Amino acid sequence: MGKEKTHINIVVIGHVDSGKSTTTGHLIYKCGGIDKRTIEKFEKEAQEMGKGSFKYAWVLDKLKAERERGITIDIALWKFETAKFYVTIIDAPGHRDFIKKMITGTSQADCAVLVVACGTGEFEAGISKNGQTREHALLAQTLGVKQMIVACNKMDSTEPPFSEKRFEEIITEVKSFIKKIGYNPATIPFVPISGFNGDNMLEPSANMSWYKGWSVERKEGNASGKTLLEALDCIIPPQRPTDRPLRLPLQDVYKIGGIGTVPVGRVETGVIKPGMVVTFAPQNVTTEVKSVEMHHESLPEAQPGDNVGFNVKNVSVKDIRRGSVCSDSKNDPAKESKSFTAQVIVMNHPGQIGAGYTPVLDCHTAHIACKFAELKEKVDRRTGKKVEDLPKFLKSGDAGIVELIPTKPLCVEAFTDYAPLGRFAVRDMRQTVAVGVIKGVTKDDGSGGKVTKSAAKKK
């Protein structure tokens, strides 16, 4: 086998009819984990239902339906390979909880693939004031997705088909709006494709001989190519934050007979290993780690990205819970957040948000109501510059700096210190009404917590 390929995560974004599903389906279909038998079964069903023209999207729809019914489908189905990487598609929007998932993200996307439809009138609809193209791109930027690829889809339905003029017109427009959001167009490949016919997806298309290819300039090295697959192959792989202090938000806490208390979660930053003395916030409980396991094998050390279970001494299941954060007691231990300041972008709130509003925040694995105690300023969401001091309220489309107070103990961090613990979704009326990035946190001083005997010995 040789060295395993690097794993990267992508998120596919764009307006509802841009052809995200077809494009994604095509990649999975041609380079991915779906076995031929499953594909043939899907194709036959698609034909029978008169959806033959829709086969790639159909593949994706089948996968989505199974995923939504809670059938844990083989996650390999959402993976495909490039020459250098194993690529996992974290999620494609269209899912009601897409935004929430992207924020509380079980995994941070390394790159966003923005799909725009080039058909006459379609591009304009997606990029208009209420189109999702800008919203998704802004979201990706706000949540720290640093890299982007733009796939100009449906080139087969421009007038005339495969029109160079239309492609140029569209990339000029896209460059202008992504620049406003904060992306540098020089670092972004723009690829004209047909997700359905396969033009420029895996092989250069004969239909667009005018297209000389994409090229990008960036400090990590320049790159160029012709196809979407090559653009994906040029993503800069993520640096794992092993050098940061430990942060591990708990997904669950189990009580296992004969072993004891086993918290489970994903290491976001730092490392965790047996013998380490850890502190759980906001409960302020300190104890020793006995063992660390992943996939039923014990590990000498777990790193960022690893989903692990670990056994702790003399801590009851009542002491800690989902949403608690495990940290190294000797290296910037996590503490309870008394209040925090955040920049929020209001997205689809039907009314307006004023001081006193108390919705539920989803931040890492925590799910806790927080009160908007004070609206400090209204800012221009593109530049971050202040527009107004102490606004009375914020409505859809506004961005502001706000002071939030949790209604129950909570542990969050500033985005610049620990990114995965510093972004949140504001949920109300069963939808995401705002997203936020935490600027600063007022922490409890952390005195008077519970310390187990084994932890005290090691102090």
From Swiss-Prot:
The modification 5-glutamyl glycerylphosphorylethanolamine is found at residues 301, 374. Pfam families: GTP-eEF1A_C (PF22594), GTP_EFTU (PF00009), GTP_EFTU_D2 (PF03144). GO terms for molecular function: GTP binding; GTPase activity; translation elongation factor activity. It comes from the Eukaryota. HAMAP family: EF_Tu_A (MF_00118_A). Residues 153-156 are annotated as: G4. Residues 14-21 are annotated as: G1. Belongs to the TRAFAC class translation factor GTPase superfamily. Classic translation factor GTPase family. EF-Tu/EF-1A subfamily. Residues 194-196 are annotated as: G5. Residues 5-242 form the tr-type G domain. This protein promotes the GTP-dependent binding of aminoacyl-tRNA to the A-site of ribosomes during protein biosynthesis. This is Elongation factor 1-alpha 1. Keywords: Cytoplasm, Elongation factor, GTP-binding, Nucleotide-binding, Phosphoprotein, Protein biosynthesis. Its main location: cytoplasm. GO terms for cellular component: cytoplasm. It is found in: Cytoplasm. Residues 91-94 are annotated as: G3. Gene3D superfamilies: P-loop containing nucleotide triphosphate hydrolases, Translation factors. The lineage of its organism: Eukaryota, Metazoa, Ecdysozoa, Nematoda, Chromadorea. Coiled coil: none annotated.
